[in-house]
Amino acid sequence: MGQPQEQSEGTEAGKPPLRVGMVGYAFMGAAHSQGWRTAGRVFDLPLNPVQAVICGRDAAAVRAAADRHGWASTETDWRAMIERDDVDLVDICTPGDSHAEIALAALAAGKHVLCEKPLANTVEEAASMALAAEEAHARGQVAMVGFNYRRVPATAQARRMVAEGRLGRLRHVRVTYLQDWLVDPQFPLTWRLRREQAGSGSLGDLGAHIVDLAQYLVGEPLAGVSALTETFVRERPLPTGATSGLSAVTSAGTGQVTVDDAALFTARFPSGALASFEATRYATGRKNALRIELNGERGSLAFDLERLNELSFHDATEPGAEAGFRRILVTEPDHPYLDAWWPPGHGLGYEHTFVHQARDLVHAIAEGRRPEPSFADGLQVQRVLAAVEESAEKNSVYTPIAV
């Protein structure tokens, strides 16, 4: 175990600490660290988040991550971290193959849990996690899955407008999530390209986000899907040494890609709305292009993650001469989360979604309520991903979502 650093357990007198232990320190570990480090400094929280311990298998690398991101101590075994008395919450930022084991152990040990998306690699794993979370809730524990795009103020505002009936009955939902970091066939075979670690490819990495976002905005789960998936490059250079999932050094050998590179599917909501989804890591020139549009009887909303401080809104009840999409700049104190940030017109970024995620989780713990999204929500997304894979394997046959 690394030597503890000096860290206050309260930025304000009288607030009890929420001592966080995090497993994983790469891309998502850095993002979650930012959230825990900042939430209590920006928002008036009922508990004070304390970065107690960070865990990873490489002692030197995890020590460097602790120094860089403000963690007080380190562990190289997540089991030892869970057993510590100075950990109240376990934050899981590892590849999907370890989510279930860590989360189940943490819940059994009486800890609160935050788990990165997708919740697990299989429906069976996700179901066991959701059941354990429900049982833990009866003991006063909280378990949340990290779909951070719910925490963009603009998407939270969109959800508010849909719930208020501003769009009327929904007819269409269109969602795309496009990246291009796998276009080069010489990109190495990192863990994100291995089914045994990642569970799926673009479907779980990107598709999980847009399935959750669509269901969150519409307010109901998908009923069924018809899907296509494809793996464009089936063999890649093997990496040398450790990988982050997004980068590595290549060796002379090659290995098999065992996940999808792209997924396309159409879907139905129980209310009758039709939806289309596209997730790919082969959209040349697109770095992180998540876009969603909802069309209803009375209006439409559109959101673009690359312009994440804006919503486009069309009100079909306006006079024809004045009709059309207009921009809503989501930076006002009345918008979700923004009363604690900057004056109107000063935008936020990707990293702020993790601050908002930490804020919401702290409130759920303090209030003893189920967080959103819950492990049950994560299980629902996992069922959609499984139905997409089943449909694609059966030549795109319409596949109902299991409940």
Regions found by a protein language model. Name each.
Residues 2-9, 216, 234-260, 264, ...:
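C-terminal glycine/acidic-rich active-site capping loop/insertion
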